């Protein structure tokens, strides 16, 4: 199994909908949240603002069941495909990426 490079403390973690490949959110994992994700099969992240671990959906019920975990070529960024239950964004939107800045370049 490929190891993840946590030498900088946190790794950006991109969450994709396993059904359609849509980007749902970006969060950060530290080594402990990564291990909890591997152990439970559900996403755990590290909150930079609260300085603590959080289990996605533990309060809202909008959980993310892990289907696949990928790493980039440097092993310092993760991409996780999930089965999303309910919206991924705390605003109630399906994805955290709903603010279009510009298109038609």
Swiss-Prot record:
Signal peptide region: none
GO BP terms: L-histidine biosynthetic process
Residues that, per the record, bind Zn(2+): 73, 89, 96
Pathway(s) where this gene product acts: Amino-acid biosynthesis; L-histidine biosynthesis; L-histidine from 5-phospho-alpha-D-ribose 1-diphosphate: step 3/9
Transmembrane spans: none
Any one GO MF annotation of this record: magnesium ion binding
Gene Ontology cellular component annotations, sorted alphabetically: cytoplasm
Keywords per UniProt: Amino-acid biosynthesis, Cytoplasm, Histidine biosynthesis, Hydrolase, Magnesium, Metal-binding, Zinc
Compartments reported by the entry: Cytoplasm
Residue sites binding Mg(2+) per the record: 72, 74, 76
Cofactor-binding details, from the entry: Binds 1 Mg(2+) ion per subunit.
Cofactor(s) listed: Mg(2+); Zn(2+)
Gene3D superfamilies xref list: Phosphoribosyl-AMP cyclohydrolase (3.10.20.810)
Catalytic activity line of the entry: 1-(5-phospho-beta-D-ribosyl)-5'-AMP + H2O = 1-(5-phospho-beta-D-ribosyl)-5-[(5-phospho-beta-D-ribosylamino)methylideneamino]imidazole-4-carboxamide
Annotated InterPro entries: PRA-CH, PRib_AMP_CycHydrolase_dom, PRib_AMP_CycHydrolase_sf
Keyword Cytoplasm: yes
Quaternary data: Homodimer.
Name recorded for this polypeptide: Phosphoribosyl-AMP cyclohydrolase
């Amino acid at each position: 199994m490929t190891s993840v490079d946590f030498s900088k403390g946190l790794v950006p973690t991109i969450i994709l909908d396993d059904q359609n490949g849509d980007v749902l959110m970006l969060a950060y994992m530290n080594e402990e949240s990564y291990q909890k994700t591997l152990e439970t099969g559900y996403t755990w992240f590290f909150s930079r603002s609260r300085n603590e671990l959080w289990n996605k959906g533990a309060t809202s019920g909008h959980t993310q069941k892990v289907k696949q975990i990928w790493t980039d070529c440097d092993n310092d960024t993760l991409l996780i495909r999930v089965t999303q239950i309910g919206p991924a964004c705390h605003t109630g939107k399906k994805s955290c990426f709903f603010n279009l800045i510009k298109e038609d370049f």
